[in-house]
C-alpha cells in the first residue's frame, strides 16, 4: 500500500513526465480530430410516410406540400443560369480541353452573352419567341450545347435534343413531329445527313442548320440547292450581336424542352417538360442534399453522360444555380480518366456500366490471394465506418488501397449519384467504401423529369431506390394479371407531382396510356415498399427492360425479327438489368435444321445437331444477319445462344393458352444455361 502511495504522489522523473504529457496531448488531439459520424436525419426504419389515397412521401418532408423551387430568384431555367452568374461573380462556367492540355474556361457572362447573340440571330432569321418554336440540338456534350440550350430559354423557345442512337429514321420522325425548322449541330457529318434528308424530301420543314465545327463550301452549296441555309455558329453569333434583341424570358409554366425517348417499339415519343418541371426536380434534390452537401461556386462536375437525357441536365442545372463549373470530357470515353484527373470534379454523376468497369478492373488487379485478402479487408473495414456514418478518405485503408481509385476519378469527389439502370449490391458497396464520399442511387424516368426517388443519407443498404423526393408522391397500383396488389405493398409505380410531364407531343393516345385523369404518371415499373419505407424495383409491367448501360429492350420485338431465321422454330431472348448484352435460347425447326446443318458440312440426328458447336455458331450468325436486315441495333442482338431440342409448349408450362411466352417461367427453366452463357462471355 505504501509503495502505491509513493508511486502516485512522489515527483516523476522529467523524461517520464514528458512522456505522460505527450501521451495525454496525443489522446486530446485524437479526440478533437477523430472523424465525426454523420447521424441519419430520419428514422431509417420509417423512411417514407403514408398519405391520403395510399401514396407515400419522403419522411424528411415536414408536410404534404410539394416543392416548386429552391431559390426564389430561380423559377425558370433562364433565371437559374442568371442566378449562377450572380452568385459566382461571373466566375468560370464551362470548361473544355484538348489532349494533354489543361482545361480552358468560358465565364458565366460569356456564356450568357453568346446565348443572347445566338438567340438574337434566330429571331433575326424570322423564328419566334414562342412556345411552338422548336429548336433541334444535335451534338455531343460540349460548351456550345449548353449555349444553344440557353439561347432557347433566353427567348422562350423550346429545345429539342437529338442524338445518334435515335437512328436516321427516328431523327426524321422527330424533326417532322416537332416541326423543327432549325437544327444546331456539331459536325459536318451530321449536317450532311440532315441535308440529305431534305434533298430526299423527307424533312421539308428544315430550313436552317447552324454548325459548331468548320465546314466546306460544298456542304453550303448542297444546302442552298435544297433550300437550307448553312451557318457557322460563329457567324450566327456575330449576326445576333449586330441585330441584338432584348431577352424574352419564359414563365415557369412554359415548355422548356421536348425529350424524345428512343423507344423500343413504334415511333419515338416526345415528353413535354416545362421549366417548372425541371426546376422543381432540381429543387427536390437540393432540398434532399441540404443537410450534408450544399453546392457552391467551388464545385465542379464532369459532363460525359448524354445531354440529350435529363439526368445529366439536372446535375448541370443544380450546379448552375449555385455558380458551379461544368467541365466537358474530350468526347472519347476512353479518355475520361485522363479528363477527370485534369478536372478534379467534386460532383460525379454516373451510371452502373461505368462503375462496373472500374470495379471489375480493381478486382482483376488483385491477382494474388494476399492482394484479394487485403482488398476485401479494406472494403469491409471502410464500409463499417460508412455504416457508422463516417465518410472520409484519409484513413489508413485509403492511403494503402483506395488512393489510386480515388485518384483515377480526380481525387476530390464529394458526391456521387448513380442512376439510369440498377446497380448491383457488391458494386455499390465497394464505391461507398472506396470513394470516401457520399454515394447515392436515384430512380426515375424522362416523364418525371429524371428523378422521383433517391436513397437517404445514413442508409447504406443496397437493393432499393430510396424514398420519394420532395417534389412528388409515389403510390403503387394493382396489377392483377401479374398478381401484384397494393394491399401487399406491391404494384405499378405511379408518380404525381410538380416534376410530372405534360404529355407526349401531338400524341394524346400515348399520353392517356401513361397519364391518368388524376395526374398520376404510370411508369410501367413494378415496385415494392420494403418494411423500412424504401422502394424496391421488382419487375416491369410490360415486357420491356433496361440493360446495364441504360438501353431499353423489347424482347418480343427482337424475337419476332429472329423468327424469320429459317432454322429457328422458337426463340427466347433474355436480358438482365445488371448485364450489358442479351443472350437467347433457340429451339430449331426439326424439318429445316438438317438441311441447314448440311450446308456447313454437319450431319447427324436432330439431338446431335442441337449439341453441335458449329451448328450453334451458324444459327447465331444467321440470327445476327436477320437481325441486322430487320433493323435491330447492335445492343438488341443476342451475343450467344443455347440450342434446345424440346419446343416450348402449354403442357410444359412455358407458353400461355394463347401461345405467348411465359418469360418468367422460361428464365427459371433455363436459369442454368443462362448463367453459363453469361459466364462464357467476358463483358
Curated annotation (Swiss-Prot):
> Where does the record say this protein resides?
Mitochondrion; Endoplasmic reticulum; Mitochondrion outer membrane; Endoplasmic reticulum membrane
Q: What is its main location?
A: mitochondrion
Enzyme class, broadest EC rank:
ligase
InterPro entries registered for this protein in UniProt: AMP-binding_CS, AMP-dep_synth/lig_dom, ANL_N_sf, LC-FACS_euk
UniProt-listed SUPFAM superfamilies: Acetyl-CoA synthetase-like
List where the protein spans the membrane: 12-32
Purpose: Catalyzes the conversion of long-chain fatty acids to their active form acyl-CoAs for both synthesis of cellular lipids, and degradation via beta-oxidation. ACSL5 may activate fatty acids from exogenous sources for the synthesis of triacylglycerol destined for intracellular storage. It was suggested that it may also stimulate fatty acid oxidation. At the villus tip of the crypt-villus axis of the small intestine may sensitize epithelial cells to apoptosis specifically triggered by the death ligand TRAIL. May have a role in the survival of glioma cells.
Family as reported in the entry's similarity comment: Belongs to the ATP-dependent AMP-binding enzyme family.
Identify this protein by name.
Long-chain-fatty-acid--CoA ligase 5
What species is given as this protein's source?
Answer: Mus musculus (Mouse)
Top-level taxonomy: Eukaryota, Metazoa, Chordata, Craniata, Vertebrata
Amino acid at each position: 500500500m505504501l509503495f502505491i502511495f509513493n508511486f502516485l504522489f512522489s515527483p516523476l522523473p522529467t523524461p517520464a513526465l514528458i512522456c505522460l504529457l505527450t501521451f495525454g496531448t496525443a489522446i486530446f488531439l485524437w479526440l478533437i480530430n477523430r472523424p465525426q459520424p454523420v447521424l441519419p436525419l430520419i428514422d431509417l426504419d420509417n423512411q417514407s410516410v403514408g398519405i391520403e389515397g395510399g401514396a407515400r412521401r419522403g419522411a424528411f418532408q415536414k408536410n404534404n406540400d410539394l416543392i416548386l423551387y429552391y431559390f426564389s430568384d430561380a423559377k425558370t431555367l433562364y433565371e437559374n443560369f442568371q442566378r449562377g452568374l450572380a452568385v459566382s461573380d461571373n466566375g468560370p462556367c464551362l470548361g473544355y480541353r484538348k489532349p494533354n492540355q489543361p482545361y480552358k474556361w468560358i465565364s458565366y457572362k460569356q456564356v450568357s452573352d453568346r446565348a443572347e447573340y445566338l438567340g438574337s440571330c434566330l429571331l433575326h432569321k424570322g423564328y419566334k419567341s414562342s412556345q411552338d418554336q422548336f429548336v433541334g440540338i444535335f451534338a455531343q456534350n460540349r460548351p456550345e450545347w449548353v449555349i444553344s440550350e440557353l439561347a432557347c430559354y433566353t427567348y422562350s423557345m423550346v429545345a429539342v435534343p437529338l442524338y445518334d442512337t435515335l437512328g436516321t429514321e427516328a431523327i426524321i420522325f422527330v424533326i417532322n413531329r416537332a416541326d423543327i425548322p432549325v437544327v444546331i449541330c456539331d459536325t459536318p457529318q451530321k449536317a450532311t445527313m440532315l441535308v440529305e434528308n431534305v434533298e430526299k424530301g423527307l424533312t421539308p420543314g428544315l430550313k436552317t442548320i447552324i454548325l459548331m465545327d468548320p465546314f466546306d463550301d460544298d456542304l453550303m452549296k448542297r444546302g442552298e440547292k435544297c433550300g437550307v441555309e448553312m451557318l457557322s455558329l460563329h457567324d450566327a453569333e456575330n449576326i445576333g450581336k449586330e441585330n441584338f434583341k432584348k431577352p424574352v424570358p419564359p414563365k415557369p409554366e412554359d415548355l422548356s424542352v421536348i425529350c424524345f425517348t428512343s423507344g423500343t417499339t413504334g415511333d419515338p415519343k416526345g415528353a413535354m417538360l416545362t421549366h417548372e418541371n425541371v426546376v422543381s426536380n432540381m429543387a427536390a434534390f437540393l432540398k434532399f442534399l441540404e443537410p450534408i452537401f450544399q453546392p457552391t461556386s467551388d464545385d465542379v462536375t464532369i459532363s460525359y453522360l448524354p445531354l440529350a437525357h435529363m439526368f445529366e441536365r439536372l446535375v448541370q442545372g443544380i450546379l448552375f444555380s449555385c455558380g458551379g463549373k461544368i467541365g466537358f470530357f474530350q468526347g472519347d470515353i476512353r479518355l475520361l480518366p485522363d479528363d477527370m484527373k485534369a478536372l478534379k470534379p467534386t460532383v460525379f454523376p454516373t451510371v452502373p456500366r461505368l462503375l462496373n468497369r472500374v470495379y471489375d478492373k480493381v478486382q482483376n488487379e488483385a491477382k494474388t490471394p494476399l492482394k484479394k485478402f487485403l482488398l476485401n479487408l479494406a472494403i469491409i473495414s471502410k464500409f463499417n465506418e460508412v455504416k457508422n456514418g463516417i465518410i472520409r478518405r484519409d484513413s489508413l485503408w485509403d492511403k494503402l488501397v483506395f488512393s489510386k481509385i480515388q485518384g483515377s476519378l480526380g481525387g476530390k469527389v464529394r458526391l456521387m449519384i448513380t442512376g439510369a439502370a440498377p446497380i448491383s449490391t457488391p458494386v455499390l458497396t465497394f464505391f461507398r467504401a472506396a470513394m470516401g464520399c457520399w454515394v447515392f442511387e436515384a430512380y426515375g424516368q424522362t416523364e418525371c423529369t429524371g428523378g422521383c426517388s433517391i436513397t437517404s443519407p445514413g442508409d447504406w443498404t443496397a437493393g432499393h431506390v430510396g424514398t420519394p423526393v420532395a417534389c412528388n408522391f409515389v403510390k403503387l397500383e394493382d396489377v392483377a394479371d401479374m398478381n401484384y396488389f397494393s394491399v401487399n405493398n406491391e404494384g405499378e409505380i405511379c408518380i404525381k407531382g410538380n416534376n410530372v410531364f405534360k404529355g407526349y407531343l401531338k400524341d394524346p393516345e400515348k399520353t392517356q396510356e401513361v397519364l391518368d385523369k388524376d395526374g398520376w404518371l404510370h411508369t410501367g415499373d413494378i415496385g415494392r415498399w420494403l418494411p423500412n419505407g424504401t422502394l424496391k424495383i421488382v419487375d416491369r409491367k410490360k415486357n420491356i427492360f433496361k440493360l446495364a448501360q441504360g438501353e431499353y429492350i423489347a424482347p418480343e420485338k427482337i424475337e419476332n425479327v429472329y423468327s424469320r431465321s429459317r432454322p429457328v422454330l422458337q426463340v427466347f431472348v433474355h436480358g438482365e438489368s445488371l448485364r450489358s448484352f442479351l443472350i437467347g435460347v433457340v429451339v430449331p425447326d426439326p424439318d429445316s435444321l438438317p438441311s441447314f446443318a448440311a450446308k456447313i458440312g454437319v450431319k447427324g440426328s436432330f439431338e446431335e445437331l442441337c449439341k453441335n458447336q458449329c451448328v450453334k455458331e451458324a444459327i447465331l450468325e444467321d440470327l445476327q444477319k436477320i437481325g441486322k436486315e430487320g433493323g435491330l441495333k447492335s445492343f438488341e442482338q443476342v451475343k450467344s445462344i443455347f440450342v434446345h431440342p424440346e419446343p416450348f409448349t402449354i403442357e410444359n408450362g412455358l407458353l400461355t393458352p394463347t401461345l405467348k411466352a411465359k418469360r418468367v417461367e422460361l428464365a427459371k427453366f433455363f436459369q442454368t444455361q443462362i448463367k453459363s452463357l453469361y459466364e462464357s462471355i467476358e463483358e
